[in-house]
Amino acid sequence: MSFPVTENIAKSQRHISFYLACGMPEATPIIFLHGWPELSVSWRHQLPTFGNLGFRALAPDMRGYGRSSIYTRHQDYALEQVVGDMIELLDAIGVERAIWVGHDWGSPVVWSIAQHHPERCHGVVSLCVPYIPEGFAPETIIPLSDRKTYPEDRFPAAQWDYQLFYRDNFVAASAGFESNVRATIRALFRAGDPKGKGKPARTAFIRASRGWFGEANTAPDVPVIRRY
């Protein structure tokens, strides 16, 4: 028997989570949390694979993404709030524990679930981001930077410069991405250049450039050169 991927909504008094699901409702849940800038559909290949292996595979749009609740205040995106969303999602599907899989910005969320709600975990998997006990924040990750690639005098925040830009320019950063959503997606998801391997990442220049797209604060209209 093959299980389809379905669209679902979990509502509480504080939040709405849209999520995709595949598999038997009574099976052990494995919940996939995406990073930035992604959506639940980023897990479109994993959901049917694990759903048809005997798990109940789920992938939510995280807070602020897609069809889940979107908030305008910076503090509404604190890890405490995002973790609360995931615990409510677990309650909504009527289970006590899940296997949590996080990628990129989803990784700090799954680690925080394990730290603060171990009773809601069968296991935790982190892709791309290691476990950092002190928390995934600029103050803890900047000191771990590779200073051969990012000399401190030129790149004080290393590849994490973009995080400081977001923190200090939340409204402007949001406006820049929203000014032309289609162009933003094309710009951020265009294919990388192999010549950039081993060189400072674009994320290290965001404050100096006054944003991802410079002073214009809107994405250029780049062509689509690859489709997935």
Language model: regions and residue ranges:
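A short loop-to-beta-strand scaffold at the N-terminal edge of the catalytic core in hydrolase folds
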Residues: S12-C22
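Short, well-structured alpha-helical interface segments that form or flank functional binding sites
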Residues: I9, H45, S179
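Active-site donor-binding loop signature of nucleotide-sugar glycosyltransferases
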Residues: S12, M62, V129
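Short acidic-hydrophobic surface loop/beta-edge motif
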Residues: T6-S12
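Flexible "cap/lid" subdomain of the alpha/beta-hydrolase fold that forms the substrate-access gate
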Residues: F3-V5, S17, R67-R97, V101, ...
